[in-house]
Amino acid sequence: MPGLFAAKKLKSKRQKFKWKDTHYKRRSLRLDVKADPLEGAPQARGIVIEKVGIEAKQPNSAIRKCVRVQLIKNGKQITAFAPGDGAIGFIDEHDEVVVEGIGGPSGRSMGDIPGVRWKVTKVNNVSLQEMVKGKIEKPVR
């Protein structure tokens, strides 16, 4: 049993050992936000640099249509998935797109697309989903 007036010592000791816990340390130093290209934001705008096809992981066999995007706010480059049948046709180089998280576990990639954590939601301020459905035409800039 610790002494009657040992609370301060116990508390400071616990505080010191907290830093050995990886989850506490990453949370306290905000390492996930610092490493995130979107800097903790839910969405970000960017300019399309090029279109890329990424092969799906085993056991699936497909080429997932993605785009390389340079973010406007910090200049970092990310790869974003273009969801929808024929969606890549509505995205051209130098278009302005809005990207958001793809919805994988713990902010990671989803399904069989390796290393892709984001998806395109808007192209030139028009919803990509609406363009794929045929409800809206892509505006000419």
Curated annotation (Swiss-Prot):
It comes from the Archaea. It holds the Pfam family Ribosom_S12_S23. One of its GO terms (biological process) is translation. SUPFAM superfamilies: Nucleic acid-binding proteins (SSF50249). GO terms for molecular function: rRNA binding; structural constituent of ribosome. InterPro entries: NA-bd_OB-fold, Ribosomal_uS12, Ribosomal_uS12_arc, Ribosomal_uS12_euk/arc. One of its GO terms (cellular component) is small ribosomal subunit. Keywords: Ribonucleoprotein, Ribosomal protein, RNA-binding, rRNA-binding. With S4 and S5 plays an important role in translational accuracy. Located at the interface of the 30S and 50S subunits. Part of the 30S ribosomal subunit. Belongs to the universal ribosomal protein uS12 family. This is Small ribosomal subunit protein uS12. It comes from Methanothermobacter thermautotrophicus (strain ATCC 29096 / DSM 1053 / JCM 10044 / NBRC 100330 / Delta H). The lineage of its organism: Archaea, Methanobacteriati, Methanobacteriota, Methanomada group, Methanobacteria.
